[in-house]
Amino acid sequence: MRTEEFTPKPNMALGKYRHYKGNFYDVLELACHTETHEWYVVYKSLYDSKGNPETWVRPYTTFTETVNIKGTAVPRFQKVTD
């Protein structure tokens, strides 16, 4: 394996996050795509998913980006401190 092809693992706290739409999720792990070497966030919904998937993956860059809500930039996901 050639490690020079991999980008460093992002420094991201695991645990509870709130999505900008209001639902809560538990970030379980960061995973690296086998082909692109892009980092992904593996997270699980902390609400009744009503038959929808409970565990999700999203590119790290998308998970940590800001979104524009009524002219205000807000984090897509915000770390929650208990």
Name every feature range the model reports, one short phrase each.
Residues 1-82:
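Mixed-charge, low-complexity intrinsically disordered regions
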